[in-house]
A protein has these predicted regions:
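Mature catalytic domains of secreted/periplasmic carbohydrate-active enzymes
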Residues: 1-178
């Protein structure tokens, strides 16, 4: 609540990160990244996990004032499943837009945008290049985003000193903007 209050007070739009992937909850159906966790697989139940996610999203979208964007991640955990995994995004996006019609939806799923999404994301890449092998989808007419690290890791790593130069960061931004 403090973050939302401070953002609203300062006129800063509130964007929230939400991971579809959850290695902690037993009802999350493990994808390729969680198969070696040693967790039991008999409790996996996407219907229950989907209800849990939507309860969380409802809380986030009703208790903290205007939310300008939900940025999803982790969908790629099931990108190598033999049968395509149905995340039921249409239902989830409908819920978001019912609760906050102005809220943008972005999903870092490495696919072409789905109905209900407002931003196309290119992870560790710029539109049309696919150097990282994660962004081979066609470039849409939606606003574009490049999802980058400032060095080589997503989280804090005391030994990672390989920071991008200011020129490289500007090149990434300009290349994404077109």
């Amino acid at each position: 609540a403090d973050l939302a209050t401070a953002c609203h007070k300062q006129g800063i739009s509130l964007h929230l990160y939400y991971s579809h992937l959850d290695w902690h909850r037993l009802d999350y159906p493990l994808g390729r990244t969680g198969l070696k966790l040693g967790r039991p697989t008999d409790k996996q139940n996407y219907d229950e996990y989907f209800k849990f996610m939507n309860r969380q999203l409802t809380e986030l979208l009703t208790n903290y004032g205007p939310v300008d964007c939900i940025w999803f991640d982790g969908w790629w955990d099931h990108d190598s499943d033999a049968k395509p995994f149905d995340w039921r995004l249409d239902e989830q996006y409908r819920l978001i837009h019912q609760l906050q019609p102005q809220c943008l939806v972005a999903n870092n799923h490495h696919q072409s945008p789905y109905a209900g999404e407002d931003i196309q994301i290119f992870e560790r890449d710029v539109p049309g290049e696919n150097k990282a092998g994660l962004s081979g989808q066609e470039v849409s007419q939606l606003p574009l985003e490049t999802c980058q690290t400032m060095n080589d890791t997503w989280g804090y790593n005391i030994t990672d000193k390989n920071y991008k130069s200011a020129d490289e960061i500007v090149r990434l931004l300009v290349s994404t903007a077109g």
